[in-house]
Amino acid sequence: MGSISVTMFSDAACPWAYSVSPSLRVLEWRYGEQLGWRLVLIGLTEQASQYLERGYTPLRGAQSQLRFRRYGMPFAPQPKERVSATARACRAVVAARLLQPGSEWRVFRALHLATFTTPLLLDDDVQIAEALRQLPGVDADAIIARLDDRAVSDAYERDKAEARTAAGSAAELQVKTAQTDGPVRFTAPSLVFEGYGQRLIAGGFQPIEAY
């Protein structure tokens, strides 16, 4: 564990979280083992109907990706077969964390890449498994088999609850929070730095200079 802990609140469906990847690599390169990272899954939606009720469509999703290309990550905007929820993908990341601590980061990045460059549906277990089979040392089938395990469900719910503790935080003052399903939550990719008696919050997407 590094001398400074970094908690990242994120979700595999968020283009802002995907677009911050270059900045995260810079932080890792500059500070290395001084930083101890922890990934907390927000769980943006449990059901696709939540997105549909907000007016999301496959075409709208593809079109919205165009404005994120300027941040340097690859996007292949094409309308997906349908709108999908994010809970199953978040559970896959949590399952990876429990099965093989540390592998959750690779699983998370693989799902991010597949989300924005392929037709992947984040709530389709078969498609999630296909995306993860490309990762050496990751047992995609074992991850999928545990998506509904009690341990995974409990850990996922803890992540969701922690992500929804942003009320009154610096992130809220930065107007980098949301309230889509009850409590005020952190938006992706919020970073919380803790160490040397300080707690600093960079809410939502930020340029590398903010970190």
What are these regions (language model features)?
Residues 16:
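Short, cysteine/histidine-rich loop/knuckle motifs that typically chelate Zn2+
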Residues 1-7:
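Extreme N-terminal starter segment of soluble prokaryotic enzymes
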Residues 19-126:
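Structural alpha/beta surface segment adjacent to cysteine/selenocysteine redox centers
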Residues 3, 81, 180-182:
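Residues embedded in well-ordered secondary-structure elements
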Residues 10-13:
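Short pre-active-site segment immediately N-terminal to redox-active cysteine/selenocysteine motifs
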Residues 20-28, 110-211:
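C-terminal cap of thioredoxin/glutaredoxin-like
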